């Protein structure tokens, strides 16, 4: 039975448009985790718990268009040097350095999310007695882990020798430490750092 408006025009109903899939945007892959960590670090700083900051990425600006002073647009820039890890700072008198990554994979963490220079930097931090780790999030499972750099480095070296290109989730569960999500702070990784690095 066809439905009609009082004017006699036929009612066609609301046909939903085909769901358009947004183009893949890899620039903000870790943005949710990054936002959570930035809020957590601000919480730690405000309460005098720890001083941890996100490292800025060193960029060399080459060309800027000035159509008008208030609308300057950077048209060409490049990274000055390879960035190391995402975050560093100090907690309880110890240097802390870590990388934060997330994946939509449910069964393993792809090592392609890391770069060789980041792994070498982690090796140097560990060699000098710093606390170094990765915070890994399985975004579809809403699970976040702290994995000590030694385990990440070992898996990286296996990959370099022709081994597996990802860390199985079971290995992260076995050697990593679950970080519960909360409200204040959002990702209380410092409580995990206390348990892993300060209760030996």
Curated annotation (Swiss-Prot):
GO cellular-component term (any): cytoplasm
Ranges where the record places region Disordered: 1-27
Superkingdom of origin organism: Bacteria
GO biological process: chromosome segregation; DNA recombination; DNA repair
Residues annotated for Mg(2+) binding in this entry: 84, 86, 99, 118
GO molecular function, one term: nucleic acid binding
Cofactor(s) required, per the database record: Mg(2+)
Site residues, Transition state stabilizer: 101
Cofactor note: Binds 1 Mg(2+) ion per subunit.
Keywords carried by this UniProt record: Cytoplasm, DNA damage, DNA recombination, DNA repair, Endonuclease, Hydrolase, Magnesium, Metal-binding, Nuclease
A Pfam family: RecU
Annotated catalysed reactions: Endonucleolytic cleavage at a junction such as a reciprocal single-stranded crossover between two homologous DNA duplexes (Holliday junction)
Known EC number: 3.1.21.10
Localization, UniProt: Cytoplasm
Enzyme class label: hydrolase
Function statement: Endonuclease that resolves Holliday junction intermediates in genetic recombination. Cleaves mobile four-strand junctions by introducing symmetrical nicks in paired strands. Promotes annealing of linear ssDNA with homologous dsDNA. Required for DNA repair, homologous recombination and chromosome segregation.
Subunit structure, interactors included: Homodimer.
Family matches, as HAMAP family: RecU
Family: Belongs to the RecU family.
Name of the featured protein: Holliday junction resolvase RecU
Species this protein is from: Geobacillus kaustophilus (strain HTA426)
Name of the gene encoding the protein in the UniProt record: recU
């Amino acid at each position: 039975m066809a439905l009609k408006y009082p004017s006699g025009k036929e009612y066609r109903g609301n046909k939903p448009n085909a769901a358009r899939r947004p183009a893949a945007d890899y620039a903000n892959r870790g943005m949710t985790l990054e936002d959570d960590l930035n809020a957590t670090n601000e919480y730690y700083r405000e309460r005098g718990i720890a001083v941890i900051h996100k490292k800025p990425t060193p960029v060399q600006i080459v060309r800027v268009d000035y159509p008008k002073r208030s609308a300057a647009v950077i048209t060409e820039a490049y990274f000055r040097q390879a960035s190391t890890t995402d975050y560093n700072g100090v907690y309880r008198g110890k240097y802390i350095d870590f990388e934060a990554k997330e994946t939509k994979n449910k069964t393993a963490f792809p090592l392609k999310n890391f770069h060789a220079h980041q792994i070498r930097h982690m090796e140097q931090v560990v060699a000098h007695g710093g606390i170094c780790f990765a915070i890994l999030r399985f975004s579809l499972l809403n699970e976040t882990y702290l994995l000590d750099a030694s385990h990440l480095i070992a898996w990286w070296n296996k990959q370099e020798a022709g081994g597996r290109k990802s860390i199985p989730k079971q290995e992260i569960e076995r050697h990593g430490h679950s970080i519960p999500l909360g409200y204040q702070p959002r990702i209380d990784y410092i409580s995990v750092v206390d348990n892993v690095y300060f209760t030996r």
